[in-house]
A protein has these predicted regions:
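Positively charged n-region of N-terminal signal peptides that target proteins for export
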Residues: 1-5
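Bacterial N-terminal signal peptides
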Residues: 7-16
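Low-complexity, acidic/polar, glycine-enriched regions of mature
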Residues: 21-202
Length: 202
């Protein structure tokens, strides 16, 4: 139930980005070429982990900053660079949120930022987007592939800025990043669900 609620929150934030967005996913070819800045207020990095095999427990990170270079005619030129404040982590339990920021988990005091930097972007049939790159978390850098699709594009009716929104999914193994408390009983595989909104920089 928690996972479903967070997933709904992550995806729903993009549904009203554009008054011109179609009911079906728009074509990546419709996106304007240029450099985009992350709309931090509407970008969330959700995660889900098996809680001792009983439930899938979810939380999210917020406050991401960074840039996205888009060239629809030449996807090989696309580039994504994101920085995430680790202490932005939030769950439905305040005590757990505080624990996750501590030294036994993400240690946000020592490692205040996580980052993702793409190395290649490919657009496949049907507009499926594959992003390869490196995730740096807890002082460790590992490869991470994201599978994304365009959610919407157009002028945001509130900010009046040209905006594009994507949803992306990926998986990491937390022990690879030195976050190993209670492993393997507490799930090692972490599923990522990312809602990303980006505003064209004039």
């Amino acid at each position: 139930m928690i996972r479903t609620s967070v997933s709904f929150l992550l995806t729903a934030t993009l549904s009203t980005l554009s008054v011109t967005a179609a009911t079906t996913a728009p074509s990546i070819d419709s996106v304007k070429k240029g450099t985009y800045g992350i709309d931090s207020a509407h970008t969330q990095v959700g995660f889900s982990i098996s809680h001792f095999g009983f439930t899938n427990y979810a939380g999210l990170f917020a406050g991401a900053t960074g840039t996205l270079i888009l060239d629809p005619a030449h996807p090989a030129n696309d580039k994504l660079d994101v920085t995430i404040p680790v202490d932005s982590i939030v769950t439905t339990v305040p005590k757990l949120t505080d624990e996750l920021k501590g030294g036994q988990w993400f240690d946000s005091a020592k490692f205040p930022q996580a980052s993702y930097n793409s190395s290649a972007v490919a657009v496949g049939p049907g507009g499926d987007i594959t992003i390869t790159g490196n995730l740096t978390l807890h002082g460790v850098t590992k490869p991470l592939t994201l599978h994304a699709h365009l959610m919407g594009t157009g002028v945001n009716p509130i900010s009046k800025k040209y905006t594009v929104g994507f949803e992306a999914k990926g998986k990491i193994t937390r022990t690879d990043f030195g976050v190993s408390l209670y492993a393997p009983a507490l799930g090692e595989e972490v599923e990522l669900l990312i809602a990303g909104a980006f505003e064209l920089q004039e």
